[in-house]
Amino acid sequence: MTAMWLAPLIALLASFLTSVALAADNPLRIELVTEATSIQPGKPFYVALHLQHSVGYHTYWKMPGIVGVPTDMKWKLPQGWKADAIEWPAPERVFMFQIKAQGFRDEKLLPIKITPPKNLQPGAMKLEGRASWMCCGRDCNPGFKDLSIELPVSSEATPPGIRWSKMFAENFADIARECGDWTIHATRKSGTIVLRIKPATERAKLHLREIEDVTFFTGDGLIDPNKPESLSRTGVEIVLTQTISEFAPKPLPRQVAGILQTPQGWLPDGKPKSIRISTPLRD
């Protein structure tokens, strides 16, 4: 009797240990996916790098901070095809060991717009490229992988596939955009950048008191994400002070560009969580 239940238990344990070993050896699973079910000549569509991180691991945003390397895709497309840059979702705070950086955990799509030529002929098209990344957790793992996806060419549009449509929609919603409900002024002061965030509409004014936490993700390396932030507030504005990075571009940019993020959201409905800013830097 004991042997009857012990054998499957041992098999289950072996399977579990194998999966743990695989997760340790391969902390990132990456594939090329699309919600498109066909390609129409001359009509742009989206593919995406689908990232699945093992628990405790992360990859990096387009501007990682003072450590890390952003995920990239080098395409090998036929003549007449065009691949745009990655449309980056808003990042989150991650850690390379004890160093704060900007990146992604868990599951994420990195969308890329593809434009086929107008004279595309019927048949099947295979799109190929080589992905590169740095995945870090308790260790760091640089990686490269050849990826491809094949779709039929159709003269008429076909419905998007069910498998990826929801996740594409969620990731597009997570791409930070400008928000006219707020004005941001940036000044340089003794090795720091001071952002003054003021409501510009009545709904933003009503929501100001609800905002408790704000994080800035630098888009160009001007700010050091690993240095402490100072957040203060008055009845009319939020003031965020950050340290200029010793690795900042020289001469310093005349704009402060990046993502402002708050878990309370920037408007009364709790959305958006992230907004894109690009504002002049004044002395």
Language-model regions, residue ranges each:
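Extracellular/lumen-exposed scaffold segments
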Residues: A21-D283
